[in-house]
Amino acid sequence: MLNQTSKKVLCTCLKCRQNDTEGVGCLISKSTRTRHRKQEKKTAEINSTLSSTTSSLSISDIRSSSESESSMLMDQDENIDFLHSNASEANIISTSVDRPEENGLNESSSLLDNMENLSSGRDDCFFNIDESDVEQELSPNVIDELSELSESSADNSDFKGEIQLTEELTCALRLFQVKSQCNLTDNAFHQTMVAVNGKYKDNDFCEYCQTSRFQTRKHVSRQQMAFFSIKDHLRIQYQDPKRSKELRYRANYTSRQGFGLDGIIGDIFDGARYQKLLSNGYFEDDRDVALMGSVDGYQIFQQKTDDCWVVLIINANICPEERVKKENLLIAAIIPGPKEPKDFNSFMYPIIKELKELEDGIDCYDRLKNETFLLHAHILSWSGDTPGLTKLMQLTGHNSYKGCRFCDIRGIYLNHVYFPTKPPMEKENEYERYDPENLPLRTHRQFKDRIFQLNQANSKRERKELETEFGIKGRSILFNLKAIHFPNSFPIDLMHLIYENIAYYMFKLWTGTFFNDNSDQNIGDYILSQSEWKIIGKEMHQARKEFPTCFGRPPRNIVLYHKGYKAKEWAAWITMYSLPLLKGRMPQKHYKGWAKFVNAVRLYQKLSLTSQDINDIRFLFQSFYDYYEKEYYQSLEERLSTMKLCFHNLLHIADSIENTGPCWATWQFLIERVCGMLLPLARSRLHPYKNIINNIHVWEMFNHLQFYQNMHTAIFPLQEVKHNSNNLAYSQPDSEEVLRSPSKRHNLRQSELKKIKEHFSTTHNVRGRKLMTKKGHQIGSKWARQNQDWAHNNYSVLVIMEVDRWSSFPQKTPEFVLKKFYGQVEYYLAYEFDKVTYMLAYIHWTADVREDSAGLISFQKFGAHEFIDAFAIDHYVGFFQIKTTYYVIDKDVDYTDE
């Protein structure tokens, strides 16, 4: 033993000093000490280079500690944690640095300081680069220049990032962006059920799975979640004058005449929640920020064994067209798996901590006004699917007796819990009956009182009974936020509710596959035969080219592919294809019942709603629910499974819109798209969660680089916009519409001459193939559709023109009204008459259209041809031919509002 000790020498490298309890160093072999010294020297050289290279790119500092400074000195076969933080009380990966005066959090908006942290030789560095990589990517001149820039910026406290970048340096930074798309892996994660903070901060073992908090023989936490600072996110944006101006959208929107009184609901600010906060003194400064939160979990691999949860923050102060773009979203937290989180409060702790500080106000510099102000931010809503909101709100979930978060309806158990308003006839005396138009709604005060009762329970058994009675498991950490109101701050997600649940269940009912195969309940006059469904699927497939490409994915055979349908395809099935395909095949009562649902969905999809629209939505969903409960449930116990919670939630949709604004503002399409973007980031099978977190952090850095205009423009020059002037056949200076090529001189036929005489006078001129509308749509023509194998029909149009209401009565004074017409564009014509050029469209009109009681428009044949002003074309539609009837498919539900 003595002999072995004598062969060892003292190593005082940073790693060994940290592993020694006294901080002196460790006794190791000479060869190991030599390797440590080389590694430490290499790390110091790389850090000197990279801290300068990337000093202008960070979005915010990383929470760190003295314990985290050894990561770059680990053995070469180990990966490095991009955002590792061993000493963090909550073991949360943050974009903030410890500062004593703010309890361990620091918000620095300096890009230079931030990227120094990111590239320093600490455990929060995000990737492991060897010396050869740096030498290959950065020439000595670039390295010297970066060092000079770093020194000059450090000496100048007023440095604003306005520096001159050489071509070599910009190439190096572009290369860094390319690297951000590569595989950045790190140490392995274990199952994550709780975050170690709050009541868990002193625990050494997880109380759910009993696994150790620390790595073997190291006082280092095994697991970390990623947290990205909301405060830094907002501060950085206000440093850019352009973005600071864009953040006034909320103030501009709410300053319109009649706001809050005109009954218009066009954004989340028209909802009752915002109006209530406004009346209570919130959002007094035009620069105060309104936020929206969203949570969702997804499977990172196809085998669906590894969960990952995302907390997304959306800035409602940005206009709707921009707030949904990737660069304007903030992924506030990544909760790694593989297990789903058991205590969601523990993971929300750092987010709520920052949101509370933002409620009280933080110092922020506004570059637009060149002044420091007190920035307040309040979160208006939290959205998510049912499992997500169940965790967030601390509810017992949709499988419990009190599964509805909006009302106190009690479910009925039959192998599962279901929610009819009328109990089965056999058990009318056992269960309560509810009025669908007057449900017992929950209130914020009721939530708080019930949580108090839970906490006063004398035993676990008593608490469990109260949880079942109330449908609440405990106190959500969201109660710490003043702006949150239970349950009105948690809107219904119509993407999952309508498109992925109800549409699918209705299809199963109509195909006779809803109940188990051994059940005798797969009967009813609403069921269509297999032969009818086969024809429906064939008609959908044959119509694939008859709809404009802007309608989305062409219809797929629903019989063959319904299991692979996504939300958008179910939405298209509901609003565009279902009524024409079911008309004449389904009994009239069922067709009319389903039409109420379809029309309600089409209404809530509108970008802007009126009070009358909301009343109509409430009435239509109520009517559909009554029809559904009567025809499909029939108050029979054996059919109780038809009354799933999703059908009950239809009764709360109108109230949800009134509270938090139109559905598009809060539905889950946005976070589902974010989860889809995160899927390819898990390139590492061994360390997928670190892989995802690393890449997201690099995303955030480049997203925030746009707010440092000079550097962003130098690194990523603006791309020259293509004006397609060569494709322009004709345009007018006072018009937003233009004619697109190809074009040619055209001699009008006799029949065309006759038609144009009716409009103006005879002549010939340039004929165009496409019309670019003011909405940016390119409406084609029959002349343009040359390749019939793949070209889609995008020349069927809706035309709105003024007509004389009394044209059949010449003696009456003309009274012009707007009227809709449908037709197909043969071609466009730039027509010159009396030195004035007109843009005309040669239209093949449909015959008279008919509208049935469900609002479905159809016609039997086409009619005459006519020249019209191209400006009268509003948008394109689809003509869905079924047998001898053409049905008008119109996806643009908002054309009347423009």
What is the predicted role of each segment?
Residues M1-K7, T185, V194-D202, L392-H398:
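Short, flexible, mixed-charge glycine/proline-rich loop motifs
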Residues M1-S157:
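Polybasic, low-complexity terminal segments and linkers that are predominantly intrinsically disordered
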Residues K8-L10, N203, Y401, L840:
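Residues immediately within or flanking Cys/His clusters that coordinate Zn2+
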Residues D113-C125, V134-Q136, D202-N203, T211-D270, ...:
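Domain-level detector for long, ordered catalytic/regulatory cores in large eukaryotic signaling
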Residues I264-G337, I409, P580-L582, R602-L603:
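Acidic, metal-ligating active-site segments
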Residues A316-C364, N703:
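Compact, glycine/acidic-enriched structural inserts
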Residues F406-I409, Y434, N438, R442-F447, ...:
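Terminal interaction-prone segments of large eukaryotic proteins
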